[in-house]
């Protein structure tokens, strides 16, 4: 917005100026007049690319000073403002708040525990603990003796019994223990049960062979499960 120049005077909630005998209202940067007579202040944030609402004020001068304070915070001392920085003028709201906060911090309250604040942390030095392999002994010296640790209760374990293998299930591999005598009879070290059938289920039935009387002449492999 444009800022008018000339001698200004405050008349109620509006700021007017006399130019060539005519009264004209001065317009400040970042200030707009509402239809009901109050003045609104806003500023454009250069980082967010959006307008920031500063509030509504009773006079245009108050709204202009609020804009100046926000402009200095966003753009620094080189910001374009409505009023120059003057020691006689009241400080902006944020500067006034910082001064009041500093004054309150300098006052000592007898009913306040100052150990809870960061300004008094120098009274309580912090001991830096070494981060070496001897950390266990260092921690023990700071925190006192270690509490006795409870050993977990041990449960008795009994040996598992080997699984019982059925007598019908035998292995036909070469590693099975067996003894061959001179009569070509195979005597197994373990007690085996005679197979129920003397024929192989993988071959077709033999009609010309007596399965019961001529068992010695039958040459076939036994199917053992």
From Swiss-Prot:
Q: Which SUPFAM superfamilies match?
A: DNA-binding domain (SSF54171)
UniProt subcellular location: Nucleus
Motif stretch (EAR-like (transcriptional repression)): 199-205
Return the Pfam families for the record: AP2 (PF00847)
Keywords, alphabetical: DNA-binding, Ethylene signaling pathway, Nucleus, Plant defense, Repressor, Transcription, Transcription regulation
Write out the GO biological process terms.
Answer: defense response; ethylene-activated signaling pathway; negative regulation of ethylene-activated signaling pathway
Q: Which Gene3D superfamilies match?
A: AP2/ERF domain (3.30.730.10)
Q: Which GO terms describe its cellular component?
A: nucleus
Q: Name one GO molecular function term.
A: DNA-binding transcription factor activity
Q: What induces it?
A: Induced by jasmonate (JA), ethylene and Alternaria brassicicola (locally and systemically). Moderate induction by wounding or drought stress does not require EIN2, whereas induction by NaCl does. Transcripts accumulate slightly in cycloheximide-treated plants, a protein synthesis inhibitor. Seems to not be influenced by ethylene, exogenous abscisic acid (ABA), cold and heat stress.
Q: Where is this region: Disordered?
A: 127-197
| CDD domains linked to this entry | AP2
Bias category Low complexity: which stretches? 132-143
Annotated region of DNA binding: 27-84
> What does its UniProt record remark on the domains?
Contains a slightly degenerated ERF-associated amphiphilic repression (EAR) motif, which may be involved in the activity of transcriptional repression.
- Subunit field text: Interacts with SAP18.
Function as written in the Swiss-Prot or TrEMBL entry: Acts as a transcriptional repressor. Binds to the GCC-box pathogenesis-related promoter element. Involved in the regulation of gene expression by stress factors and by components of stress signal transduction pathways and could also regulate other AtERFs.
> Which family is it part of?
Belongs to the AP2/ERF transcription factor family. ERF subfamily.
Name of this protein: Ethylene-responsive transcription factor 3
Q: Which organism is it from?
A: Arabidopsis thaliana
């Amino acid at each position: 917005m444009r800022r008018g120049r000339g001698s200004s005077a405050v008349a109620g909630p509006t700021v007017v100026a006399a130019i060539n005998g005519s009264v004209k209202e001065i317009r400040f940067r970042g200030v707009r007049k509402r239809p009901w007579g109050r003045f609104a202040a806003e500023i454009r944030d250069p980082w967010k690319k959006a307008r920031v609402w500063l509030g509504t004020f009773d006079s245009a001068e108050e709204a202009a000073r609020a804009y100046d304070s926000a402009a200095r915070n966003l753009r620094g001392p080189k910001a374009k403002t409505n009023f120059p920085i003057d020691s006689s003028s009241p400080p902006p709201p944020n500067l006034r708040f910082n001064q009041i906060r500093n004054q309150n911090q300098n006052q000592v309250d007898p009913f306040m525990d100052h150990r809870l604040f960061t300004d008094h942390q120098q009274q309580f030095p912090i001991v830096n603990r070494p981060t070496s392999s001897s950390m266990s002994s260092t921690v023990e010296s700071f925190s006192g003796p270690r509490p006795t640790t409870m050993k977990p209760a041990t449960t008795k374990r009994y040996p598992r019994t080997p699984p019982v293998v059925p007598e019908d299930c035998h292995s036909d591999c070469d590693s099975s223990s067996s003894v061959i005598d001179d009569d070509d009879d195979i005597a197994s070290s373990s007690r085996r049960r005679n197979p129920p059938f003397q024929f192989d289920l993988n071959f077709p039935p033999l009609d010309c062979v007596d399965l019961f009387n001529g068992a010695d002449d039958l040459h076939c492999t036994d199917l053992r499960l």
